[in-house]
Amino acid sequence: DWQKEIFRDAFSTDHNVSMSGNIAGQPFRASLGATIQNGVIKTSTFSRLTGSLSYAPSFFDKHLNVNANLKGMWAKNRYADGSVVGDALTFDPTQPVYADGADYMTSFGGYFQWTGKNEYGDPSWPLAYNNLAQANPVSTLDLQQNRAISRSLIGNLELDYKFHFLPDLRIHIN
């Protein structure tokens, strides 16, 4: 059953913790998060770590308000080739996942594939992949390494100043 070979029960976790309070009467907030998701296709995974800091002090009898924010994220993703779903539905169910023989190990990592005559003249490549036939969906998942790592850091600083001599006059910088 090719579907049993490529699919799995997906399990995910998502954890967050935050803390807020005052340091010397000045408010702050900090948070951390972690996400781990395993996709329904066996090799698909996603992991993410997040963090944020916020600090909002006031100075000069609350005439100068500051709001500083910093947010960061790191994510790692392994993508599964979506074509394996169609291949699993239509691949010959009588064929094995793995093939016996040194030629299959050399050419296809030990996985069964529909082959054709090698017309390239390269003796180190004993079998040729038949590109008119479907690929073994398990070999597609295991031999492809579609990965990505993402990182981002965003910061913001906001200043709001009310003049002492004219409180309705303000300067706001963001």
What is each model feature region?
Residues 1, 40-41, 50, 54-154, ...:
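Surface-exposed loop/interface segments of Gram-negative outer-membrane beta-barrel transport/assembly proteins
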Residues 1, 8-52, 60-64, 153:
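Outer-membrane beta-barrel translocator/receptor signature
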Residues 8-24, 33-34, 135-174:
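Outer-membrane beta-barrel transmembrane strands
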